[in-house]
Amino acid sequence: MQLQRLGAPLLKRLVGGCIRQSTAPIMPCVVVSGSGVFLTPVRTYMPLPNDQSDFSPYIEIDLPSESRIQSLHKSGLAAQEWVACEKVHGTNFGIYLINQGDHEVVRFAKRSGIMDPNENFFGYHILIDEFTAQIRILNDLLKQKYGLSRVGRLVLNGELFGAKYKHPLVPKSEKWCTLPNGKKFPIAGVQIQREPFPQYSPELHFFAFDIKYSVSGAEEDFVLLGYDEFVEFSSKVPNLLYARALVRGTLDECLAFDVENFMTPLPALLGLGNYPLEGNLAEGVVIRHVRRGDPAVEKHNVSTIIKLRCSSFMELKHPGKQKELKETFIDTVRSGALRRVRGNVTVISDSMLPQVEAAANDLLLNNVSDGRLSNVLSKIGREPLLSGEVSQVDVVLMLAKDALKDFLKEVDSLVLNTTLAFRKLLITNVYFESKRLVEQKWKELMQEEAAAQSEAIPPLSPAAPTKGE
């Protein structure tokens, strides 16, 4: 928008109008120069509904400070099951189903409150029909599962994201968002994020990560579904994209995830696997206790959900924070977690991979077996192993290469046509799976080889008696 030169009376009326229409404490910026008075363009929002009693705020997720991690270890929760899911870079968004006695109303919320139906919030109206069907299906599933006659309030929280994918072979969205008042906006003009990465799709999407419900409708009666229940319900809702575990294990195993080199798998899930973007790092991950929300877990009064961001993203989002992140997380929290898991960086599960890639990943890892390890060792021979000529690292590499070689012989051509990024991921995964197996078996193998060698050496013949004996 070009700046407009304004006379004083018109300026006063416009500034006053902006203040009256917006509940956000944002004032238009007035610039005075020698050539006149200018009003800078400021985004103003439609007023929120006066009654926000149905709004249920989403919590701010904590960063993994050293003190928080220590508290989790002291409470005993750190040794229990946690999951790490991708942290999608978008804007917080909630889908509400509110029981008003004789009927149910669907409403939509941003982080600060339920929105006026005519607020243009990043083009979400284009997805309203899908959202409405999904929240109603979810409501029916909940009532059926728990034997409920009604649900007072149901909230599906997630992230609105997308509308940006700068690849020369991927066209911009041609869709338009139409508000109830008739105003129209192109999805291609939506800008949820300004950072160059991560990018997901030229179309607008929703990524669900939490479900909570209140039978009475009262805020104090809300029940937050644990992760496994969340997945159970989300998987039954048609076309719902939801948070799936990249890693499942102890808190340390989740913290050991290599967030610094994690490329977002979402474009592939959204059909853009053949059009990867170089350096398309994920923002990070969210790590949560699988029973977050359970009173038995929450009674410890410690954080049961934390977020990790890669330092490259932090530098873009908050310039100058990269050093702080390194000092407060990479050199402390994550290094401590890596020590406790003995340096094993957890391999990404196939839950966030499309069907073909997931099947290929399973097939490849199945090739890393005890039988294959025995075959590799037989090719090496006993002496090089016992003398140290062939090291444990050498065996890992030989096992990984052998598994990969046979995998390529039997795999479908579809897999050979997957993205370069996925093929690199396969190589990484087969290496770490080989490393895990060799480390698990190494001590036992070396003892067996040593015992076999001692049995193979014939006993020394008794010395011949010397003359005079």
Curated annotation (Swiss-Prot):
Its main location: mitochondrion. InterPro entries: RNA_lig_RNL2, RNA_ligase_dom_REL/Rnl2, Rnl1/2_C_sf. It is an enzyme of class 6 (ligase). The keyword Hydrolase does not apply. Keywords: ATP-binding, Ligase, Mitochondrion, mRNA processing, Nucleotide-binding, RNA-binding, Transit peptide. Its EC number is 6.5.1.3. ATP binds at residues 59-61, 86-92, 111, 159, 209, 307-309. One of its GO terms (biological process) is RNA modification. GO terms for cellular component: cytoplasm; kinetoplast; mitochondrial mRNA editing complex. The active site is at residue 87. Residues 450-469 are annotated as: Disordered. It comes from the Eukaryota. Residues 1-44 form a transit peptide. Pfam families: RNA_ligase. The keyword Membrane does not apply. It is found in: Mitochondrion. It catalyses: ATP + (ribonucleotide)n-3'-hydroxyl + 5'-phospho-(ribonucleotide)m = (ribonucleotide)n+m + AMP + diphosphate. GO terms for molecular function: ATP binding; RNA binding; RNA ligase (ATP) activity. NCBIfam families: RNA_lig_RNL2. Essential for RNA editing. RNA editing in kinetoplastid mitochondria inserts and deletes uridylates at multiple sites in pre-mRNAs as directed by guide RNAs. Belongs to the RNA ligase 2 family. Component of the RNA editing complex (editosome), a 1600 kDa complex composed of at least 20 proteins. Interacts with terminal uridylyltransferase MEAT1. This is RNA-editing ligase 1, mitochondrial. It comes from Trypanosoma brucei brucei. The lineage of its organism: Eukaryota, Discoba, Euglenozoa, Kinetoplastea, Metakinetoplastina.
